[in-house]
């Protein structure tokens, strides 16, 4: 199998996010970035499939500025064979990212193209399906179990109230959900080896995109609640507060 894994660099999920000076992007000063957690499932699935087959190649792709090299090195440390950074300036929208990825993947001869189900910074769930559409490939999203046999995949995806089982032929695009596997941690040996693995940087000029961010702001602080008492004796005070302060009565 020849497998591509498409990755994104996102702020650490425990980091405190604040708007930047321009109020249209986040302030990255002192902010820690990590490999998108859902993409870890995609990396692990690629590695496990190669190990099970006993042969093949795994390639990681990312679209973004030079700082994305660190994210790709994380995938290389986990065991990915080589990586490609489609280097861009700014923050292209999902469609521009999908077009850039599709342009690179089209001639790669990949049997399987893996994405995380979503990126935790924007929750759009767009890029994987758009790449599939641009490449005219079948796509199964939010996959929690995957089987490959005889040139076809059988995928389980959790839906509200049950599990949907989908079959399609290879090549295919799969977006990976929690439960698909348990991502490995990079070992020291892998971290050292990652420094010597190929990481190709391909400068690219993307379009302006069709989405404009007008502004970012933090949610307004809410006033803390108040406990007015318990039982029937608290009802008059509660009614008074609802009428005089909350003004909902």
Give, region by region, the residue ranges found by the protein language model.
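N-terminal glycine-rich FAD/FM-binding segment characteristic of electron-transfer flavoproteins
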Residues: 1-249
């Amino acid at each position: 199998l020849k497998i591509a894994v498409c990755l994104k660099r996102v702020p650490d999920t425990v980091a405190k996010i604040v708007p930047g000076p321009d109020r249209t992007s986040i302030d990255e000063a002192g902010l820690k970035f990590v490999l998108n957690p859902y993409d870890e499932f995609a990396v692990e699935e690629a590695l496990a499939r190669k190990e099970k087959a006993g042969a093949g190649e795994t390639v990681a792709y990312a679209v973004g500025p030079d700082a994305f090299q660190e994210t790709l090195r994380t995938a290389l440390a986990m065991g990915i064979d080589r990586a490609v950074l489609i280097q861009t300036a700014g923050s292209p929208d999902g469609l521009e990212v999908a077009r850039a990825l599709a342009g690179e993947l089209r001639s790669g001869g990949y049997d399987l193209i893996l994405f995380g189900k979503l990126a935790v910074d924007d929750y759009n769930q767009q890029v994987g399906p758009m790449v599939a559409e641009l490449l005219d490939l079948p796509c199964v999203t939010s996959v929690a179990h995957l089987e490959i046999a005889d040139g076809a995949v059988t995928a389980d995806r959790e839906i509200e109230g049950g599990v949907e089982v989908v079959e399609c032929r290879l090549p295919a695009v799969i977006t990976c959900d929690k439960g698909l596997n348990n991502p490995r941690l990079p070992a020291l040996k892998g971290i050292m080896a990652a420094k010597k693995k190929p990481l190709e940087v391909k400068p690219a000029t993307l379009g302006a995109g069709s989405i404009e961010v007008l502004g970012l702001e933090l949610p307004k602080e809410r006033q803390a609640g108040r406990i007015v008492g318990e039982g029937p004796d608290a009802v008059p005070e509660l009614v008074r507060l609802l009428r005089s302060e909350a003004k909902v009565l």
